[in-house]
Amino acid sequence: MSRTKSSKRWLQEHFDDVYVKKAQAEGYRSRAVYKLKEIDDKESLIKPGMTVVDLGAAPGGWTQYASEKMKGSGRLVALDILPMDALPNVEFILGDFREDNVLQELINLIPQRTLDLLLSDMAPNMSGSSAIDIPRAMYLVELAFDFAEKMLKPGGNMLVKIFHGSGFDELVKQARASFEKVVIRKPSASRSRSKETYLLAKGYNL
């Protein structure tokens, strides 16, 4: 399929998408909010007073939802390589999480072992080739996991986008060695043809 036809199909699906319409009606910045909401409704991940980091935050759907759930208490830091409009009670870092100086800026904001929850919806720019895209995506997951291991408090939780493919089983195994509970979720708002799923790891063990 040509890129033009593929783009047209995506646009048509986007405008017909029930979650796009729902997000617009409810004032959310993106349909992705319903992926987090579905998981949070089942797992009660986000509570007032928490310290939360949201990686790959733009345009801000997940951050917006987390901010609402935290009710103005706690600390919420969002980071993305793309700009994001300001949200109440949110500290935003504009930068590439893969770069050391950006990572250090984030670390400087949050004392070590005080992080309650790491959220990551990071994904690379997709080329359409799984051989290229999956390794790039898994690298971002590995970086998020490394950050979580350094910053989460005992009992802390992590929710990260992860893609089926090379390295998937190894990362799940690694998570199970560090957390009390690890499950894979495919929210209803995640498009069925997408290889994305979400790894939920609860109860971090130091």
UniProtKB/Swiss-Prot annotation:
One of its GO terms (cellular component) is cytoplasm. Its EC number is 2.1.1.166. S-adenosyl-L-methionine binds at G60, W62, D80, D96, D121. Specifically methylates the uridine in position 2552 of 23S rRNA at the 2'-O position of the ribose in the fully assembled 50S ribosomal subunit. GO terms for molecular function: rRNA (uridine-2'-O-)-methyltransferase activity. Keywords: Cytoplasm, Methyltransferase, rRNA processing, S-adenosyl-L-methionine, Transferase. Transmembrane segments: none annotated. The keyword Calcium does not apply. InterPro entries: RNA_methyltr_RlmE (IPR050082), RNA_MeTrfase_FtsJ_dom (IPR002877), rRNA-MeTfrase_E (IPR015507), SAM-dependent_MTases_sf (IPR029063). The keyword Protein transport does not apply. Its main location: cytoplasm. Belongs to the class I-like SAM-binding methyltransferase superfamily. RNA methyltransferase RlmE family. This is Ribosomal RNA large subunit methyltransferase E. The lineage of its organism: Bacteria, Pseudomonadati, Pseudomonadota, Gammaproteobacteria, Legionellales. The active site is at K161. It is found in: Cytoplasm. HAMAP family: RNA_methyltr_E. It catalyses: uridine(2552) in 23S rRNA + S-adenosyl-L-methionine = 2'-O-methyluridine(2552) in 23S rRNA + S-adenosyl-L-homocysteine + H(+). It comes from Legionella pneumophila (strain Corby).
